[in-house]
Amino acid sequence: MLQQITGINAVYFYATSIFKQIGIGTDASFSSGVLLSSVSVIFTFIAIYLIDRMGRRPLLLIGTAGIALSLLLCSFGFSQATYKLERSDLSNLSFSNSNKLELITSKTYYSDVNFKKDVKRILGNQIYSKNDGEILEMATNINAKLVLTGILVFIACFAFSLGPVMWVLLSELFPLKFKGIAIGIISFINSLVSSLIQLIFPWELSSLGNALTFFIFGIIAVLGFFILLKILPETKGKSLEELESILVN
């Protein structure tokens, strides 16, 4: 479950939306999505190389710690963002009725939730949803490099720890007799949790804001790190009897 409740699939699925909200524009957000996939592939190969050299436990602990820190870094970056439209910006917006946004020009917002709420109220949900990337690019003042770095580190840490290593670990924890059904049940729960996270993620961004959403995921990762630190055995080179003895003790 820790795999999914850190928000990994939600971040992948809504990567373009997240990057729009950083204010880097629609085209750049698509390019950043490609970058995420590339980072994931590279660090998965790193995990394959290291898993039998370092062991499962160190990779999972290092990766989970990195996930927690990177998510909290994203949260901090979003919390420092401000949102402000100037009158001169309105002429650069490509959609009709952009002049309606004069009502909020020169007003500085310290919450993305309040800014988006006012823009939606003025333009309507339909116009906003079609032009949100353009509006946010104009209005957002944020350390985009900091947030982008946080997201890339998050993807990298997941790709060499919770992503591939957890499945190797699970295959070594269960006896052959129960391995198939156990991993099947875990896969089902994993997919179910992933679907639920992806369903609530857009609501979180809209209702709670970017900073609080990433903070929640970061705290979950911190808790996950300490749980793994406490109970996770090293399975490398150990028999089921040895693992059972370790877990019982």
Q: Each PLM stretch: what is its role?
A:
Residues 1-249:
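Alpha-helical transmembrane bundle of multi-pass membrane proteins
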